[in-house]
Amino acid sequence: MRVFLKSLTGLVIICILAGVIVFFLAKSRLPDMIASKLSKTLQVAVEIGDVNFTLSTIKIDNLEIGNPRNFKLEHAFTVHEILIQAPLTNYLKKDIVIDEITLNNVYIGLEFESPQGTSGNWTTIMTNTQKAQDQSTPSSSNKTVLIKRLVLNNIDADLLYQSDGKVRHLPTIPQIVLVNISSQGGNVMDQLMNSALGQMLKEIFIRENLKEIFDKIFQQIPGSDPVK
């Protein structure tokens, strides 16, 4: 009996150690898995430094979104830290509620053919995002996502017109706070990218006195509704 108990205890310890190893191996691959999914949605290169989570928070470090081909700026979007606050069980529901998303140290690159043109890097990216949401599986078509608060801290932006090749460093925006951002249809990640990115872009364009360009951008995106 004693030998049996020792063997059973040893087996339990081995199972626990195996579980811990599998967990850490899976966690180490998580940034690449999320980056790959985002890259497929946006059709651009995406890199993520690290991802950590608790039962109520997801923390993403050093997210970098590249530009589509034939654009000169290195990045379309970068953020040093993203904090997503919502119980993990919320993501299993049909109607998903996220209490708050905070983005710290944000950079956005805006690139257009000319001051008069509206064809640019974000036209391409948002078109790709809209297509990904439209093509989501039927099982996710009825899902809704509500972000109660979206907070951006310390936003820097560059503006480049390809016609003159000059990079303009726009004034830093200390903070943007958006509330009650909602969307329906598509999986959670596609909805977050489409609704949250759209609202962030709109507010940044307004703050940088570029709202007219923003409105024209959304007119060019098939199947999208202008962000209100």
Set out the residue ranges of the language-model regions:
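N-terminal "first-domain core" detector
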Residues: S28, D32-T41, F53, V79-I84, ...
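N-terminal type II signal-anchor transmembrane helix
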Residues: M1-L42, K211-E212, P226-K228
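Short low-complexity stretches enriched in small and charged residues
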Residues: L11-V20, S36-S39, T54-N62, V106-F112
